From Swiss-Prot:
The gene is murD2. It comes from the Bacteria. It comes from Micromonospora sp. (strain ATCC 39149 / NRRL 15099 / SCC 1413). HAMAP family: MurD, MurD2_subfam. This is UDP-N-acetylmuramoyl-L-alanine--L-glutamate ligase. ATP binds at G118, S119, K120, G121, K122, S123, T124.
């Protein structure tokens, strides 16, 4: 369904945040017979609904809001409306067409778009793709799940988008290049279960992309894709890391060396995988990555990564403090821990308890010497899950500040103190940025507290 298909139809936009506002303005320009906005959220009218918005669509809520949704031919929901919302279940049961602004936008721009999703790595990989394309004279607009609704993006010849599972769920068109970086259980409460989450995530691939690029090292992706044609980055026949001309690890395309691994400033094998995916996408777009290897190496060297993703904080003690607050699942925390293999690590875990299974984390740490500090709410359950592992020291502390203080006492001077919570921030913190701020402040405030 395209925006132009809404001409002459009754349309309800569900959500009054940035996505809903962008949808109202875009849809109003295409002449719907009737347009209304509905908001059932707790922060109803947190932003004023006035001017062109109010002229284009009245805003309603409560029971009247549901009645207006049910009376519409098409409902355009914001990504924040979960699949499990009882209103959404009822609307679909009544046969109401439900879509999103991202789906309407994609229908008109799919052939010019690289779409990147993944349970982890989508932000870094999409940023890398956009950054590297610019370095080889391929201008692009970067957007998606980074605060700017797709319907607000300027016109461009090429788009690179980071797409959440919520944004992927209602797509009826796949982008020209569809990319998946990783697949593991996440956001199960919003999607209704693990299978439903995978279905919504992989809907990005379901509508005829020209090329699919995936992380070939991800076992769940491999199982879900089966024998479907795809570029499996990390495999020997495509972009991968292997010994180079000087015997050190290099990035390669097939048997052709590109540049040393040391050029990439990001730590961790998972970030090697992210760059392999990004380079494979450039090749799929027709970039001669071998001929442009020098320019790409310079661009890679200048890529400093994104905030709150293995962001190191300077400390006079010799300890390396690392903010990885966006690691909200056990699998993400496992990647972060692996990034500092060979060094003593104290990892701080815990946050909002969504009932995730932490058994994979226990299995991952079974042979590793590591200190684990659990903070509320899920930290106590994580520590209990790790009980009995012979090389794991695990204890519960009162809060994040206490965890930083305790980490200074337990971690050797050349060690790493890693905030990789394996859980979301809500409940104890306003958002993930607030959790990051509290961590950084605790690091500063305890700087006079000697390491072990």
């Amino acid at each position: 369904m395209r925006l132009s298909d809404l001409r002459g139809r009754t349309v309800a936009v569900w959500g009054a945040g940035r996505e809903g506002r962008a949808a109202v303005i875009a849809i109003a320009a295409h002449g719907p017979a009737d347009l209304v906005a509905v908001d059932d959220s707790a922060n109803f009218l947190a932003l004023p609904w006035e001017g062109p918005l109010a002229e284009a669509a009245p805003l309603v809520t409560g029971e009247e809001g549901f009645a207006r949704l049910a009376a519409a031919e098409v409902v355009v929901r914001s990504p924040g409306v979960p699949n499990t919302h009882p209103w959404l279940v009822e609307l679909r049961g009544r046969g109401v067409t439900v879509t999103q602004g991202s789906a309407l936008w994609m229908a008109d721009h799919a052939r010019r778009t690289v779409g990147v999703t993944g349970s982890k790595g989508k932000s870094t990989t999409s940023s890398l793709i956009s950054h590297l394309l610019t370095a080889v004279d391929r201008p692009n607009v970067f957007g998606g799940n980074i605060g700017v609704p797709l319907l607000d993006l300027p016109d461009a010849d090429l788009y690179v988008l980071e797409l959440s599972s919520y944004q992927c769920a209602d797509l009826t068109d796949s982008p020209r290049v569809a990319v998946v970086t990783a697949l593991f259980p996440e956001h199960l409460d919003a999607h209704g279960g693990e299978r439903e989450y995978y279905r919504d995530k992989l809907n990005l691939l379901a509508h005829g992309p020209q090329t699919i690029v995936v992380n070939g090292a991800d076992p769940r992706l491999a199982a879900e894709l089966g024998d479907r044609p795809a570029v499996r980055a990390g495999s020997p026949d495509t972009t991968h890391v292997a010994p180079g001309p000087d015997g050190t690890p290099w990035f390669h395309l097939g048997d052709r060396p590109l540049f040393p691994r040391a050029v990439l400033p990001l730590v961790g094998r998972h970030n090697e995988g992210n760059l392999c995916v990004a380079l494979a996408v450039l090749a799929a777009l027709g970039v001669d990555v071998v001929a442009r290897a020098d320019a790409l190496a310079v661009a890679v060297a200048g890529f400093q990564g994104l905030a709150h993703r293995l962001t190191e904080i300077a400390d006079p003690s010799g300890l390396t403090f690392v903010d990885d607050t966006l690691a909200t699942s056990p699998y993400a925390a496992m990647h972060a821990i692996d990034a500092y293999e060979g060094r003593p690590v104290t990892v701080i875990v815990g946050g909002a308890d969504r009932g995730l299974d932490y058994a994979p984390l226990r299995e991952h740490l079974a042979e590793r010497e590591i200190t684990v500090l659990g903070i509320p709410d899920s930290g106590q359950r994580i520590v209990a899950t790790l009980a009995g592992l012979p090389r794991v020291r695990a204890e519960v502390v009162d809060d994040l500040v206490a965890a930083v203080r305790r980490a200074r006492e337990l971690t050797p001077a050349d060690g790493v103190v890693l905030l990789s919570p394996a859980a979301p921030s809500y409940g104890r913190f306003r958002n993930f940025e607030h959790r990051s701020e509290v961590f950084a402040e605790a690091v500063r405030d305890t700087a006079g507290h000697p390491a072990r």
